[in-house]
Amino acid sequence: MITEIVTFGIGNGLQRSDVVALYEKSVPAWKENRNLLHKSFLYDPEHEVGGGIYLWNSIDAAKSAHGPAFQNRIQEVFGSQPEIRYFESPVVINNHGDANVEATS
């Protein structure tokens, strides 16, 4: 499994309520992506940074979801290019289930 951390500056005069509304608007599309196991939206008002933490089945799935179209959309909406980092997640804890989930490769 792959953990992906995406961060971007929040410009364009957006307030917290604007950012949350934009996040909520994107939820249905993320729910449709069967390669996405988990997503947490991020917001840091002090540093004007937003983003997300994603858990994916594979690096290919992560890169596919956050290609040029996604990056251009972030630039247009939030006023900055996203920074994207990938991490292997060999063990994942799920406190809402009975077992830890281990990566298969």
Model-derived features with residue positions:
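Short S/T/G/P-rich N-terminal loop/turn motif that feeds into the first structured element of a domain
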Residues: 1-50, 59-68, 78-105
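A common structural junction motif
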Residues: 72-76
